[in-house]
Amino acid sequence: MRQLFNKLKWTGAKAYFSYVSRGAAGGEEVASIDDVVEVGSGGVTISTGSGERYIPYHRIVEVRLATGEVLLDRRKR
């Protein structure tokens, strides 16, 4: 997962990812790869309107390119 996020971030790919968020309607939120400020060993840190938020990799359920191509879908397990 870390390699995927690094590749997307540093190649400038337009992509989005969905992650489990307990406070969100429907239980998930979506963020852009452009929002990622750090790719770590256990997760990513994103910039939000209210600061930064750490998202562990185990909470990420989907990664999708802006074209619609799905790169990762953990919902299908």
Swiss-Prot record:
Q: Which domain of life is it from?
A: Archaea
InterPro entries xrefs: MJ1316 (IPR040459), UPF0248 (IPR007547)
Signal sequence annotation: none
Q: One Pfam family, short name please?
A: MJ1316
Which family is this sequence assigned to?
Belongs to the UPF0248 family.
* HAMAP family (alphabetical): UPF0248
Q: What is this protein called?
A: UPF0248 protein Pcal_0252
Q: Which organism is it from?
A: Pyrobaculum calidifontis (strain DSM 21063 / JCM 11548 / VA1)
